[in-house]
Amino acid sequence: MSGERAKRFPLALEDLKREPRKPEGRVAERQAAGDAARQRLTAAAAVPAAASPIVPERRAPHGGVFAAKPARAKQHAPAAPGAAKRAPQGGAKQGDRSAAPNVALSGALALTSERVRERMVERLRANGVADPRVLAAMSAVPRHMFVDPGLAAQAYEDAALPIGHQQTISKPSVVARMIELAAAGRALERVLEIGTGCGYQAAVLSRVARDVYSIERVRPLYERAKLNLRPLRVPNIRLHYGDGRVGLPAAAPFDAIVIAAAGLDVPRALLEQLAIGGRLVAPVGEQAGEQVLTLVERVAPAQWRESRLDRVFFVPLKSGVI
Protein backbone atom coordinates (compact mmCIF):
# COMPACT_ATOMS: atom_id res chain seq x y z
CA MET A 1 0.00 0.00 0.00
CA SER A 2 1.37 3.38 -0.92
CA GLY A 3 2.03 5.95 1.75
CA GLU A 4 -0.82 8.16 0.61
CA ARG A 5 -3.25 5.27 0.74
CA ALA A 6 -1.98 4.27 4.13
CA LYS A 7 -2.76 7.70 5.44
CA ARG A 8 -6.31 7.50 4.11
CA PHE A 9 -6.85 3.99 5.34
CA PRO A 10 -4.74 3.44 8.42
CA LEU A 11 -6.36 0.05 9.14
CA ALA A 12 -5.90 -2.94 7.05
CA LEU A 13 -8.86 -4.68 5.45
CA GLU A 14 -8.58 -7.50 7.91
CA ASP A 15 -9.00 -5.05 10.75
CA LEU A 16 -12.38 -3.86 9.32
CA LYS A 17 -14.05 -7.29 9.55
CA ARG A 18 -16.41 -7.62 12.53
CA GLU A 19 -17.27 -10.79 14.24
CA PRO A 20 -20.86 -11.87 13.54
CA ARG A 21 -23.33 -11.41 16.46
CA LYS A 22 -24.14 -14.58 18.20
CA PRO A 23 -27.83 -15.64 17.86
CA GLU A 24 -27.98 -16.55 21.54
CA GLY A 25 -28.08 -12.88 22.48
CA ARG A 26 -31.19 -12.08 20.34
CA VAL A 27 -33.10 -15.10 21.69
CA ALA A 28 -32.26 -14.12 25.25
CA GLU A 29 -33.70 -10.63 24.64
CA ARG A 30 -36.95 -12.09 23.34
CA GLN A 31 -37.22 -14.40 26.32
CA ALA A 32 -36.66 -11.52 28.72
CA ALA A 33 -39.36 -9.43 27.01
CA GLY A 34 -41.81 -12.33 27.20
CA ASP A 35 -41.10 -12.84 30.88
CA ALA A 36 -41.73 -9.18 31.55
CA ALA A 37 -45.05 -9.27 29.67
CA ARG A 38 -46.19 -12.31 31.64
CA GLN A 39 -45.29 -10.60 34.86
CA ARG A 40 -47.38 -7.58 33.88
CA LEU A 41 -50.38 -9.80 33.03
CA THR A 42 -50.03 -11.64 36.32
CA ALA A 43 -49.90 -8.39 38.22
CA ALA A 44 -52.96 -7.07 36.36
CA ALA A 45 -54.92 -10.22 37.17
CA ALA A 46 -54.07 -9.84 40.84
CA VAL A 47 -55.50 -6.29 40.92
CA PRO A 48 -59.24 -6.05 42.00
CA ALA A 49 -61.66 -5.87 39.09
CA ALA A 50 -62.00 -2.11 39.05
CA ALA A 51 -60.20 -1.74 35.73
CA SER A 52 -62.18 -4.56 34.13
CA PRO A 53 -65.65 -4.71 35.74
CA ILE A 54 -67.53 -7.97 35.51
CA VAL A 55 -71.19 -7.95 34.54
CA PRO A 56 -73.11 -10.19 36.97
CA GLU A 57 -74.95 -13.13 35.51
CA ARG A 58 -78.58 -12.61 34.60
CA ARG A 59 -81.43 -14.84 33.68
CA ALA A 60 -82.27 -15.48 30.08
CA PRO A 61 -85.91 -14.92 29.02
CA HIS A 62 -86.58 -18.66 28.76
CA GLY A 63 -84.98 -19.76 32.00
CA GLY A 64 -81.31 -20.01 30.86
CA VAL A 65 -78.45 -18.09 32.45
CA PHE A 66 -76.25 -15.58 30.68
CA ALA A 67 -72.56 -16.18 31.57
CA ALA A 68 -70.68 -13.42 33.28
CA LYS A 69 -68.39 -11.52 30.94
CA PRO A 70 -66.18 -8.46 31.07
CA ALA A 71 -67.95 -5.23 30.38
CA ARG A 72 -67.18 -3.47 27.14
CA ALA A 73 -64.72 -0.63 27.08
CA LYS A 74 -67.43 1.96 26.37
CA GLN A 75 -70.03 1.54 29.05
CA HIS A 76 -72.61 3.86 30.56
CA ALA A 77 -72.21 4.87 34.15
CA PRO A 78 -74.07 2.56 36.56
CA ALA A 79 -77.57 3.62 37.51
CA ALA A 80 -78.13 5.31 40.82
CA PRO A 81 -79.65 3.23 43.62
CA GLY A 82 -82.94 5.08 43.32
CA ALA A 83 -83.17 4.21 39.64
CA ALA A 84 -82.53 0.57 40.39
CA LYS A 85 -85.52 0.61 42.72
CA ARG A 86 -87.80 2.33 40.25
CA ALA A 87 -87.69 -0.50 37.71
CA PRO A 88 -89.38 -3.10 39.95
CA GLN A 89 -92.03 -0.54 40.82
CA GLY A 90 -92.89 -0.12 37.16
CA GLY A 91 -93.18 -3.86 36.78
CA ALA A 92 -95.42 -4.02 39.83
CA LYS A 93 -97.74 -1.46 38.31
CA GLN A 94 -97.90 -3.40 35.10
CA GLY A 95 -98.73 -6.50 37.06
CA ASP A 96 -101.47 -4.61 38.88
CA ARG A 97 -102.97 -3.52 35.60
CA SER A 98 -102.97 -7.04 34.25
CA ALA A 99 -104.56 -8.31 37.43
CA ALA A 100 -107.32 -5.69 37.49
CA PRO A 101 -109.41 -7.27 34.67
CA ASN A 102 -109.37 -10.55 36.57
CA VAL A 103 -110.76 -8.82 39.65
CA ALA A 104 -113.41 -7.09 37.56
CA LEU A 105 -114.21 -10.33 35.80
CA SER A 106 -114.64 -12.12 39.10
CA GLY A 107 -116.97 -9.39 40.30
CA ALA A 108 -118.95 -9.56 37.05
CA LEU A 109 -119.29 -13.32 37.32
CA ALA A 110 -120.56 -13.01 40.87
CA LEU A 111 -122.90 -10.21 39.84
CA THR A 112 -124.44 -12.06 36.89
CA SER A 113 -124.72 -15.42 38.57
CA GLU A 114 -128.12 -16.97 38.96
CA ARG A 115 -127.64 -16.99 42.72
CA VAL A 116 -127.62 -13.18 42.83
CA ARG A 117 -130.85 -12.96 40.87
CA GLU A 118 -132.38 -15.75 42.91
CA ARG A 119 -131.76 -13.74 46.06
CA MET A 120 -133.60 -10.83 44.44
CA VAL A 121 -136.48 -13.15 43.55
CA GLU A 122 -136.61 -14.46 47.10
CA ARG A 123 -137.01 -10.90 48.34
CA LEU A 124 -139.81 -10.33 45.84
CA ARG A 125 -141.56 -13.49 47.00
CA ALA A 126 -141.18 -12.44 50.61
CA ASN A 127 -142.73 -9.05 49.74
CA GLY A 128 -145.86 -10.66 48.30
CA VAL A 129 -145.18 -11.38 44.61
CA ALA A 130 -146.74 -14.82 44.08
CA ASP A 131 -147.21 -15.34 40.32
CA PRO A 132 -144.64 -18.02 39.35
CA ARG A 133 -144.45 -16.67 35.78
CA VAL A 134 -143.48 -13.23 37.04
CA LEU A 135 -140.91 -14.61 39.47
CA ALA A 136 -139.40 -16.81 36.74
CA ALA A 137 -139.23 -13.82 34.36
CA MET A 138 -137.54 -11.64 36.97
CA SER A 139 -135.02 -14.42 37.60
CA ALA A 140 -134.28 -14.90 33.89
CA VAL A 141 -133.73 -11.30 32.75
CA PRO A 142 -130.24 -9.90 33.59
CA ARG A 143 -131.06 -6.45 34.97
CA HIS A 144 -127.39 -5.40 35.07
CA MET A 145 -127.36 -5.38 31.25
CA PHE A 146 -129.86 -2.50 31.24
CA VAL A 147 -128.00 -0.07 33.53
CA ASP A 148 -124.75 1.85 33.18
CA PRO A 149 -121.62 -0.19 34.04
CA GLY A 150 -120.92 2.11 36.97
CA LEU A 151 -124.28 1.12 38.50
CA ALA A 152 -124.06 -2.59 37.73
CA ALA A 153 -123.18 -3.43 41.34
CA GLN A 154 -126.59 -2.04 42.36
CA ALA A 155 -128.55 -3.75 39.61
CA TYR A 156 -130.17 -6.35 41.86
CA GLU A 157 -130.92 -4.06 44.75
CA ASP A 158 -134.51 -2.93 45.13
CA ALA A 159 -133.76 0.58 43.92
CA ALA A 160 -134.67 2.79 40.99
CA LEU A 161 -131.55 3.75 39.03
CA PRO A 162 -130.97 6.62 36.58
CA ILE A 163 -130.72 5.78 32.89
CA GLY A 164 -130.21 9.30 31.58
CA HIS A 165 -132.51 11.98 30.11
CA GLN A 166 -134.12 12.43 33.55
CA GLN A 167 -135.54 8.91 33.41
CA THR A 168 -135.08 5.89 35.67
CA ILE A 169 -135.34 2.12 35.63
CA SER A 170 -138.03 1.14 38.13
CA LYS A 171 -137.40 -0.88 41.27
CA PRO A 172 -137.56 -4.65 40.72
CA SER A 173 -140.36 -4.83 43.28
CA VAL A 174 -142.41 -2.24 41.38
CA VAL A 175 -141.82 -3.95 38.02
CA ALA A 176 -142.89 -7.31 39.42
CA ARG A 177 -145.91 -5.79 41.18
CA MET A 178 -147.18 -4.00 38.07
CA ILE A 179 -146.78 -7.03 35.81
CA GLU A 180 -148.47 -9.31 38.32
CA LEU A 181 -151.41 -6.90 38.57
CA ALA A 182 -151.67 -6.66 34.79
CA ALA A 183 -151.58 -10.43 34.31
CA ALA A 184 -153.83 -11.44 37.23
CA GLY A 185 -153.15 -15.10 36.53
CA ARG A 186 -154.34 -14.85 32.91
CA ALA A 187 -152.59 -15.89 29.73
CA LEU A 188 -151.63 -12.59 28.12
CA GLU A 189 -151.72 -12.44 24.34
CA ARG A 190 -150.96 -8.79 23.62
CA VAL A 191 -149.49 -6.22 26.00
CA LEU A 192 -148.75 -2.51 25.51
CA GLU A 193 -146.03 -0.77 27.53
CA ILE A 194 -145.87 3.03 27.72
CA GLY A 195 -142.34 4.22 28.44
CA THR A 196 -139.76 1.73 27.18
CA GLY A 197 -136.89 3.44 28.96
CA CYS A 198 -133.88 1.13 28.90
CA GLY A 199 -135.98 -1.90 27.87
CA TYR A 200 -135.82 -3.90 31.11
CA GLN A 201 -139.55 -4.05 31.87
CA ALA A 202 -140.28 -4.95 28.24
CA ALA A 203 -137.83 -7.86 28.53
CA VAL A 204 -139.62 -9.13 31.65
CA LEU A 205 -143.02 -8.71 29.98
CA SER A 206 -141.80 -10.71 26.98
CA ARG A 207 -141.56 -13.80 29.22
CA VAL A 208 -145.11 -13.40 30.46
CA ALA A 209 -146.98 -12.33 27.30
CA ARG A 210 -147.01 -13.64 23.76
CA ASP A 211 -146.49 -10.21 22.12
CA VAL A 212 -145.19 -7.00 23.68
CA TYR A 213 -145.54 -3.54 22.12
CA SER A 214 -143.54 -0.77 23.75
CA ILE A 215 -143.48 2.98 23.03
CA GLU A 216 -140.71 5.44 23.95
CA ARG A 217 -140.88 9.20 23.31
CA VAL A 218 -137.18 9.96 23.96
CA ARG A 219 -135.21 9.02 20.87
CA PRO A 220 -131.85 8.23 22.59
CA LEU A 221 -133.63 5.93 25.06
CA TYR A 222 -135.46 4.22 22.23
CA GLU A 223 -132.12 3.53 20.52
CA ARG A 224 -130.55 2.41 23.78
CA ALA A 225 -133.38 -0.03 24.46
CA LYS A 226 -132.83 -1.61 21.06
CA LEU A 227 -129.14 -2.07 21.82
CA ASN A 228 -129.86 -3.50 25.27
CA LEU A 229 -132.39 -6.01 23.96
CA ARG A 230 -130.37 -7.13 20.94
CA PRO A 231 -128.00 -9.53 22.82
CA LEU A 232 -131.02 -11.23 24.43
CA ARG A 233 -132.53 -12.01 21.00
CA VAL A 234 -136.08 -11.42 22.20
CA PRO A 235 -138.36 -12.18 19.24
CA ASN A 236 -141.70 -10.99 20.63
CA ILE A 237 -140.97 -7.33 21.47
CA ARG A 238 -141.90 -4.55 19.04
CA LEU A 239 -140.39 -1.19 19.92
CA HIS A 240 -141.96 2.05 18.69
CA TYR A 241 -140.72 5.62 18.83
CA GLY A 242 -143.66 7.92 19.47
CA ASP A 243 -146.04 9.60 21.88
CA GLY A 244 -147.08 7.12 24.54
CA ARG A 245 -150.23 9.04 25.46
CA VAL A 246 -151.60 8.25 22.02
CA GLY A 247 -150.89 4.53 22.27
CA LEU A 248 -150.94 2.19 19.25
CA PRO A 249 -154.48 2.11 17.87
CA ALA A 250 -153.38 -0.04 14.92
CA ALA A 251 -152.30 -2.87 17.26
CA ALA A 252 -155.23 -2.59 19.71
CA PRO A 253 -156.98 -4.05 21.60
CA PHE A 254 -154.55 -5.08 24.32
CA ASP A 255 -155.09 -7.59 27.10
CA ALA A 256 -152.95 -5.44 29.38
CA ILE A 257 -151.42 -1.96 29.36
CA VAL A 258 -148.56 -1.00 31.68
CA ILE A 259 -147.68 2.70 31.99
CA ALA A 260 -144.25 3.46 33.45
CA ALA A 261 -144.81 7.20 34.03
CA ALA A 262 -147.24 9.16 36.18
CA GLY A 263 -149.95 11.41 34.79
CA LEU A 264 -152.71 13.36 36.46
CA ASP A 265 -155.09 10.84 34.92
CA VAL A 266 -155.07 7.91 32.52
CA PRO A 267 -155.27 9.12 28.89
CA ARG A 268 -158.62 8.36 27.29
CA ALA A 269 -156.93 6.96 24.17
CA LEU A 270 -155.29 4.23 26.25
CA LEU A 271 -158.55 3.32 27.98
CA GLU A 272 -160.15 2.86 24.58
CA GLN A 273 -157.35 0.52 23.44
CA LEU A 274 -157.85 -1.80 26.40
CA ALA A 275 -159.70 -4.99 25.54
CA ILE A 276 -162.88 -5.84 27.41
CA GLY A 277 -161.72 -7.79 30.43
CA GLY A 278 -158.30 -6.21 30.07
CA ARG A 279 -156.34 -4.53 32.86
CA LEU A 280 -154.36 -1.28 32.84
CA VAL A 281 -151.78 -0.50 35.55
CA ALA A 282 -150.45 3.04 35.94
CA PRO A 283 -149.19 5.50 38.56
CA VAL A 284 -151.56 8.45 38.86
CA GLY A 285 -150.81 11.76 40.54
CA GLU A 286 -148.59 14.80 40.47
CA GLN A 287 -144.83 14.44 40.42
CA ALA A 288 -144.41 16.74 43.42
CA GLY A 289 -147.36 15.28 45.27
CA GLU A 290 -148.77 11.87 46.06
CA GLN A 291 -148.76 9.22 43.36
CA VAL A 292 -150.83 6.07 43.64
CA LEU A 293 -150.46 2.85 41.68
CA THR A 294 -153.85 2.47 40.03
CA LEU A 295 -155.53 -0.57 38.45
CA VAL A 296 -158.16 0.05 35.76
CA GLU A 297 -160.29 -2.85 34.47
CA ARG A 298 -162.51 -2.60 31.42
CA VAL A 299 -165.68 -4.44 32.32
CA ALA A 300 -167.84 -3.32 29.36
CA PRO A 301 -167.47 -1.35 26.09
CA ALA A 302 -168.11 1.91 27.93
CA GLN A 303 -167.39 0.95 31.53
CA TRP A 304 -164.12 0.86 33.49
CA ARG A 305 -163.50 0.05 37.12
CA GLU A 306 -160.68 1.75 39.03
CA SER A 307 -158.77 0.53 42.11
CA ARG A 308 -156.21 2.62 43.96
CA LEU A 309 -153.47 0.49 45.48
CA ASP A 310 -149.91 1.47 46.49
CA ARG A 311 -148.12 4.75 46.96
CA VAL A 312 -145.34 5.07 44.37
CA PHE A 313 -143.11 7.65 42.73
CA PHE A 314 -142.56 7.82 38.95
CA VAL A 315 -141.26 10.31 36.42
CA PRO A 316 -144.04 12.37 34.76
CA LEU A 317 -146.00 11.13 31.76
CA LYS A 318 -145.50 13.66 28.96
CA SER A 319 -146.87 14.07 25.47
CA GLY A 320 -144.95 14.52 22.24
CA VAL A 321 -141.51 13.20 21.28
CA ILE A 322 -137.96 14.46 21.75
Swiss-Prot record:
Residue ranges the record marks as coiled coil: none
Gene Ontology BP terms: methylation; protein modification process; protein repair
Domain of life: Bacteria
Ranges of Basic and acidic residues composition bias in the record: 14-29
Annotated active site: 170
GO molecular function terms noted in the UniProt entry: protein-L-isoaspartate (D-aspartate) O-methyltransferase activity
Gene Ontology CC terms: cytoplasm
UniProt-annotated stretches for the region Disordered: 1-101
Catalytic activity, EC: 2.1.1.77
NCBIfam families according to UniProt: pimt, PRK00312.1
Protein name per its UniProtKB record: Protein-L-isoaspartate O-methyltransferase
Organism for this UniProt entry: Burkholderia mallei (strain ATCC 23344)
Phylogenetic placement of the source organism: Bacteria, Pseudomonadati, Pseudomonadota, Betaproteobacteria, Burkholderiales
Gene: pcm
